[in-house]
Amino acid sequence: MNYGKKGVRAKQKALNSKSQKWGRKLALTCVKIMLAAVVGIGICGVAAGIGVFRGILSSTPTIRLSDVVAVGEATIVYDSEGNEIDQYVSTNSNRLSVGMDEIPDYMGKAFVAIEDERFYQHNGIDFKSILRAGYQFLKTGGEEAQGASTITQQLLKNTVFTDWTSEGNNKIKKIKRKIQEQYLALEITKYYSKDEILLRYMNAINLGQNTLGVESASLRYFGKHCSDLTISECAVIASITQNPSKYNPIRHPEENAKRRETCLNKMLKLGFISQAQYDEAVADTDAVYERIGLYDIDYQEANATTGSYFSDAVYEQVKQDLILAGYNEAMAETLLTSGGLRVESTLDPKIQAILNEEYADPSNYPENVKWYLNYALTIISSDGTKNNFSKENMMTWFKENQNKKFNLIFSSQDDAYAAVDTYRSAMLAQLGVEDNADNYEETITMTPQPQSAMVIEEQSTGHIVAMIGGRGTKEGRRTLNRATSAKRLPGSTFKVVASYAPALDSAGKTLATVYNDAPFNYADGTPVRNWYKSGYRGIQNIRSAIRDSLNIIAVKNITVITPRLGYDYLLNFGFTTLTDGVQVGNEIKSDVNQSLALGGLTYGVTPYELTAAYAAIANSGTYVTPKLYTRVTDSDGNVILDNTNPPTRQVIKETTAFLLTSAMQDVVTSGTGGKVNFGGMAIAGKTGTTTGPTDAWFAGYTPYYTAATWTGYDNNVDLNSAEDGVSKTLWRKVMKRVHEDLPNPQFPVPSGIIQVQVCSQSGKLPIPGLCDGSVYTEYFAEGTEPTESCDVHYQGEICAYDGLPASPDCPFKYTGVASGRGSCITTGLHRHYQQSRRHTDGQHTEHQKSV
């Protein structure tokens, strides 16, 4: 370079030239423009960023701490003594809220130590964690870093931003949610204490095994309330939350143990526990997981997702009452399974335990248990087509190909499985599909037979105190409940409620009213048959007809009072399954007919409704709507449903109820129900058997409880003589134990009941010297007692052959006292005598027939 004067002057001259000046100005202008553009873009970018940020914040939900709760909470069902008996819970709804005073101090400290050790120092956001999370976010290409969120943010994530699981790999959605999460975390921390936030967190956090919150988790893993947990156990639960699947202490105890160790170390480091407490917890490591494993076995056995028949019935009744209260069906079910309701049921745990034990006792059933097969088969053809076969298809195939009497009832389970193998092979061959387990799916269930169900009600309150809907293993929740859902023909139990109750109550009949047990036909000409095989018993009063369950008299009685009256009384007794003109196939069916007296119905009734009807008689004629619960509240104690005073109505007079009770006491002491009698307890009831018999019942009551027991085959196979008595056996054995420690009062006699001596052959006042052998004392509702004298007994010429008043030409007459209407009949020896006379003198005189 030339740095002399001459060189410098030359350089200066060049710089001052016009062309050089223009070039410099142009370059400078370009630089300025570029700088302005950069600044402008930066400003726009910042403005846009601020706008986006403001947009995100503006879309952040406005919340209060009361809004920060888990969405779902299990509904708990309690028995009448306040013990939990069941939970209704949907997925992600098994949460039980508790107060801070019910959570051990070490539980909160364990969560703080493992999840957010600076929880009590930061303002809802831990900036150190954010920096660490940001670094991990960039390093992993957008995957959110573990431990990035504070306890406050996790609470919001699990209660407010519950749809975060749908974000997938959408980074924009994740960033938006994180910004809103952090903003709300700051807001919540401004207005609420750390302990309030921590309590909400511990009641909401997902802790695996479909549990939300520490109370639910404590009960699931340890079988005790969280207030009773040790430091060791608190650390187990706190170690789950980061990844409830990976750190599940039942499925992955080794993974949970590693994180638990970290939790305990941090608790010690932070001064939350002493060295001695730490050492004790560490020493418990093996034992704590052993306890969890052992309890899980017990839990699985006790809570095999089947629930109880009683709990199932409670669910249905609460659901229906919620619908009546204005909820639609979907809303009612959601509220029941995730609304955190508290249901106070009427179940008496002691009585229910007795019922369960007796139904599980093999000695209460015939020795040779039979099995009913329920089978479904799906065969997958080579082209992927699914071919479905039901148990009905199976039964049809066997009847057509092997056994016309095939009915899905087997003497052993082995026989049932053999039949399944035979049928499956035949169907596979029919479709040309290889007999390979990959080519078919099947469902096989077997239930012991005959089946049975029983309901027990406290008649004075309408409380259903116990219920069982079947014997054997319950297959699942809300499966067939024979106590509430199975409609079976009630047989002779209906004689009382359909025929005699209305007759005594409003048709002028009394227990002394007599009918002739003699041949009688229904209106269509079909003979009415008595349950005993041959003969008739002649004149019988209603008391003896109830005691001995006489079919003909029950039908004659309802014919006189009209089936319509009987039907109307049944509706008032609470039966909801009756029909009055319904199309079944091509026929119009109605239960308003003479066979109503014998339980001849279109569909049948349930043990639940039959129990309630008999309970009305036991309760002095007052029907109390049967109830399975008294109150339903939300988790805060607000009453949702109040069932403490269910509707009642007077179905029959108090005097009518007593008369029926008196007659049904005879059933137990000297009639068809003698097998149910026990001790000195007053019992009234009625047996019921249907044609076949396919159904066997006993419905009865004491001064305390009413119960109905049904026995039969699920597919209506006839009961044998040993099986026919199961209902009475179960009724007696259950009710005897239920009443063991109770006094033995008699049924009270209400005012308006009087006793009058009557003639059993006429139901009227006896005539001295004529009715002496037929006089007995009967109860009457005052005003219904007889005022006329006997018109059956007769003094004069008697037929020696049949004991009736002799007709004029009876060859066997003598002078004496007879009972019976009409005169002697032309049968047997009489006809032989008449024929001999016809041969001798050509004369013939017919005897009158008795009525």
Could you say what each language-model-derived stretch is?
Residues 109-112, 267, 355, 461-462, ...:
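Active-site SXXK
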Residues 2-8, 72, 79-279, 288, ...:
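Peptidoglycan glycan-strand catalytic modules in the bacterial/periplasmic cell-wall system
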Residues 140-162, 295-303, 508-566, 593, ...:
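Conserved catalytic neighborhood of penicillin-recognizing serine enzymes
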Residues 275-406:
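Non-catalytic structural connector segments
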Residues 526-531, 562-610:
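Mid-domain, small-residue-enriched loop/turn segments at the edges of structured enzyme/sensor domains
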Residues 345-366, 371-375, 379-387, 391-446, ...:
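A penicillin-recognizing enzyme superfamily signal
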Residues 2-80, 85, 138:
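N-terminal type II signal-anchor transmembrane helix
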Residues 120-130, 212-214, 274-277, 494, ...:
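Short, well-structured active-site flanking segments
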